[in-house]
């Protein structure tokens, strides 16, 4: 995690070593990796050493890809190197009015292009969920966001050697696994060129209340 109250959450050489150690432990033990991102990027006072720390983090992101689940929770304004790592993780959670992701902030954009843009227009949660496609989940509050992270973990295996988790669902009698859904016969059209609502198919096939939709 990154603490914005300490040097704006910027990455120093020592801070990068701490993050890399946690990532190594997650890989060694086959445990999901959850990052709480709230950082302004590299600590410019340390120069190249800080940038080298990002290289070490990115390397571990790629080594962990497909091995353990990697989840990024963006809970503040993140810029520069602080957004490259989340962008190559498996899932990104953002909060409206709180989370921002951009390579450079609005002030730099104004200086270079003379165009005025707000934080939300440049890298807000809705922009990344609806336009860039970077964010997978968007919520209106931090507690709701963190609760959703816990919900997602219930659907994921611990690592690539672990089986998919299963759980008992206390649904109504109408939600029996042996039920027949006659509506499926009419819902899916005969023509492969005719569209239909996939959400309705999923709701009929899956256990009630078990559908978790990702962007």
Question: Residue ranges of each PLM-predicted region?
Answer:
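Non-catalytic terminal/interface segments that mediate subunit docking, oligomerization
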Residues: 1, 23, 27, 193-215
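A structural preference for short, pocket-lining loop segments at secondary-structure junctions
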Residues: 1-3, 18-44, 215
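Flexible beta-alpha connector loops of hexameric P-loop NTPases
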Residues: 5-14, 45-51
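Short charge-dense sequence patches
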Residues: 8, 95-105, 200-210
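Conserved catalytic cores of soluble enzyme domains
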Residues: 37-161
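Terminal amphipathic helices with adjacent charged low-complexity linkers/tails
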Residues: 137-202
């Amino acid at each position: 995690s990154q603490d914005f109250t300490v040097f704006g959450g910027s990455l120093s050489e020592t801070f990068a070593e701490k993050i890399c150690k946690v990532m190594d432990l997650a890989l060694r033990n086959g445990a999901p990796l959850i990052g709480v991102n709230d950082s302004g990027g590299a600590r410019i006072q340390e120069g190249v050493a800080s940038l080298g720390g990002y290289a070490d983090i990115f390397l571990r992101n790629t080594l962990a890809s497909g091995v353990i689940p990697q989840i990024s929770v963006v809970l503040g304004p993140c810029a520069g190197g602080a957004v490259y790592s989340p962008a190559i993780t498996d899932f990104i959670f953002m909060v409206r009015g709180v989370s921002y992701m951009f390579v450079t902030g609005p002030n730099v954009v104004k200086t270079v292009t003379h165009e005025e843009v707000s934080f939300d227009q440049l890298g807000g949660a809705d922009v990344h969920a609806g336009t860039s496609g970077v964010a997978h989940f968007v919520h209106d509050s931090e507690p709701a966001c963190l609760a959703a992270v816990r919900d997602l973990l219930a659907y994921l295996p611990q690592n690539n050697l672990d089986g998919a988790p299963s759980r008992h669902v206390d649904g109504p009698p109408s939600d029996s696994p042996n039920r027949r859904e006659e509506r499926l016969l009419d819902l899916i059209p005969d023509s492969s060129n005719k569209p239909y609502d996939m959400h309705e198919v999923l709701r009929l096939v899956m256990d009630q209340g078990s559908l978790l939709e990702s962007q």
